[in-house]
């Protein structure tokens, strides 16, 4: 006959395994958050949101704030734009998209900075703060991706992609990897946010009520 463990001893074993698993998931979440921040910074900086194809009148590509368009007289690309040079950004929609993606980037970086709070604050509270920041970052990325195509009717984009180009119509151009990555990043941010919320609420209640009750009865 199998001998059952006392309630308190079983609770201690459960508690140890529970904490170990929570820490493992927390380390995984933290690592993924750091990797995700690098990804968001890359898609913010890189000017490869849309670009030319074999059918476009000239070569080039556009990002959130910078772009390069081929010279009609030569094969060289003329590049313009910068995050602080708002006058060179082709359209208001691009400026708006840049703002929201930048906001998402800073929120993700902010959630990484919040890791230092684990040493001085309640663990559950820190997880929840990071979760809300990552949820807000997902919202910023979503708004940026939705607004960005509204600027495709700008003269600079039409010059490269053809006269058929308009709002949410890319003409002869194609979507590049940075834009696709930004769309996928929305889901990544939502998953990280969900994990942080789960970790936060798990920290609020490390032991189930039935184990606590059994322990009290044993005493």
UniProtKB/Swiss-Prot annotation:
Q: Which UniProt keywords apply?
A: Cell membrane, Disease variant, Ion transport, Membrane, Transmembrane, Transmembrane helix, Transport
Entry-linked InterPro entries = LHFPL (IPR019372)
Topology in the lipid bilayer is annotated as: Multi-pass membrane protein
Query: What are the BP-aspect GO terms?
Result: auditory receptor cell stereocilium organization; detection of mechanical stimulus involved in sensory perception of sound; monoatomic ion transport; sensory perception of sound
Q: Does the keyword Transmembrane apply?
A: yes
Q: Which residues lie on this side of the membrane: Cytoplasmic?
A: 1-24, 120-128, 200-219
Membrane-crossing ranges are 25-45, 99-119, 129-149, 179-199
Q: Which locations, inside or outside the cell, does it occupy?
A: Cell membrane
The answer to whether the entry has keyword Amino-acid biosynthesis is no
Superkingdom of origin organism: Eukaryota
What the entry lists under Pfam families is as follows: L_HMGIC_fpl
**Residue ranges the record marks as coiled coil:** none
* Disease as annotated in the protein's UniProt record: Defects in Lhfpl5 are the cause of the hurry-scurry (hscy) phenotype which is characterized by rapid circling behavior, frequent shaking of head from side to side, deafness and vestibular dysfunction.
Family assignment from sequence similarity: Belongs to the LHFP family.
| Protein name, entry field | LHFPL tetraspan subfamily member 5 protein
Q: Which organism is it from?
A: Mus musculus
Gene name of this polypeptide: Lhfpl5
């Amino acid at each position: 006959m199998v001998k059952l463990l006392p309630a308190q001893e079983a609770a201690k074993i459960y508690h140890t395994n529970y904490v170990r698993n929570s820490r493992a998931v927390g380390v995984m979440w933290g690592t993924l958050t750091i990797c995700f921040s690098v990804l968001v910074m890359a898609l913010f900086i890189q000017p490869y949101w849309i670009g030319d194809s074999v059918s476009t009148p000239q070569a080039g590509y556009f990002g959130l704030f910078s772009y390069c368009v081929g010279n009609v007289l030569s094969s060289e690309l003329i590049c313009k734009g910068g995050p602080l040079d708002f006058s060179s950004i082709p359209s208001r929609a691009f400026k708006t998209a840049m703002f929201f993606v930048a906001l998402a980037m800073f929120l993700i970086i902010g959630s990484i900075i919040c890791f230092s709070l684990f040493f001085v604050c309640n663990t559950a509270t820190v997880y929840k703060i990071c979760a809300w920041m990552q949820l807000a970052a997902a919202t910023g990325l979503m708004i940026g991706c939705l607004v960005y195509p509204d600027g495709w009717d700008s003269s600079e984009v039409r010059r490269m992609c053809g006269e058929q180009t308009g709002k949410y119509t890319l003409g002869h151009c194609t979507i590049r990897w940075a834009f696709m990555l930004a769309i996928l990043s929305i889901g990544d941010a939502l998953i990280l946010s969900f994990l942080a919320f789960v970790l936060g609420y798990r920290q609020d209640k490390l032991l189930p009520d039935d184990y606590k009750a059994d322990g009290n009865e044993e005493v």
